[in-house]
Amino acid sequence: MKKCFIIKQSHIIFFLCTFLNDNNWQKIHTQREKTQIKKKQC
């Protein structure tokens, strides 16, 4: 599970997510990177 919240300060938007398990975060992060790489290759 993860909790995400957006903070707006002085015209800057921060998108912060806190994950209960670091391993899950690593898996999600690597999946996003792989999908981005695939899109770039296409």
From Swiss-Prot:
Origin organism lineage: Eukaryota, Amoebozoa, Evosea, Eumycetozoa, Dictyostelia
Protein name: Uncharacterized protein DDB_G0279853
Organism: Dictyostelium discoideum (Social amoeba)
Superkingdom, natural source: Eukaryota
